[in-house]
A protein has these predicted regions:
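A metal-dependent, Asp-based hydrolase signature
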Residues: 41-103
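Phosphate/oxyanion-binding active-site loops and adjacent basic polyanion-contact surfaces
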Residues: 38, 77-81, 110-114, 118, ...
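Substrate-recognition "cap/lid" segment bordering the active-site pocket of phosphatases
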Residues: 133-135, 139-186
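Short catalytic/ligand-binding loop motif for oxyanion handling, primarily in non-cytosolic enzymes
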Residues: 30-34, 39, 67-74, 141-145
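A general structural motif
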Residues: 17-19, 129-131, 157
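Short, acidic loop-to-helix structural element flanking the phosphoryl-transfer center
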Residues: 75-86, 90-134, 146
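Active-site neighborhood of HAD-like aspartate-dependent phosphohydrolases
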Residues: 9-62
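Short amphipathic alpha-helical segments and helix-helix/interface helices
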Residues: 13, 118-123, 176, 180
């Protein structure tokens, strides 16, 4: 396994050497949630709610539904975290919604870790003075994502582009069109 990883690392380093602009995806690439499935974060939020005597029956279902609902009513290609919690607010009230939102961000931060292999690749690109960007289809804010990157040792990159903040996504390819213009890529 280690030999395969070293071989893959060398292959990626060769590609980095041939390019000036290096991009990384964020979730499930540079950063990992230290849970089996991403939605398990909502189970952990639920546990924290119980500890605070704010038990919300079926929170995970409500949270998944709220995200789906926010996506279905959005006029943009991607949504923001606040869009999800505006839907939740209608179910649980404004005060509780704000508390739950803070808990979810805290749980995200606690269970997000650097992917050691990608961190090694990032460090190599940085050592070669490459222009490094991060791109993600994600509802969490750029500010929050940047704090997670910093906490996990990703420093010295050029920029972070988040679909929720920009209202365009990688999935539609509009993010790439935007980046091509923004970064003057031929």
């Amino acid at each position: 396994m280690t030999q395969n990883m070293d071989s893959e690392f060398s292959r990626i380093c060769n590609m980095i050497d041939e390019n000036e602009l290096i991009s990384f995806d964020i979730y499930d690439t540079a950063l990992l949630r230290n849970v089996l499935n991403p939605a398990d974060i909502f189970d952990l939020v639920s546990l924290e709610l119980k500890k605070r005597n704010m038990n919300i029956t079926d929170f995970k279902k409500i949270r998944v539904w709220a995200e789906e609902k926010a996506r279905s009513i959005s006029q943009k290609e991607d949504i923001q975290f606040d869009d999800i919690y505006k839907i939740i607010e209608n179910k649980v009230g404004k005060t509780r919604s704000k508390v739950i939102q803070e808990i979810e961000l805290s749980v995200e931060e606690k269970f997000t870790i650097a992917n050691p292999f990608i961190k090694r690749v990032f460090d190599y690109a940085k050592s070669k003075k490459k222009t490094i960007i991060f791109i993600s289809d994600m509802y969490l804010s750029k500010e929050f994502i940047c704090s997670l990157l910093k906490k996990n040792g990703y420093n010295g990159y050029f920029e972070v582009y988040i679909s929720g903040d920009l209202g365009i996504s990688k999935a539609s390819s509009n993010m790439y069109v935007f980046l091509k213009e923004q970064l003057n890529i031929d």
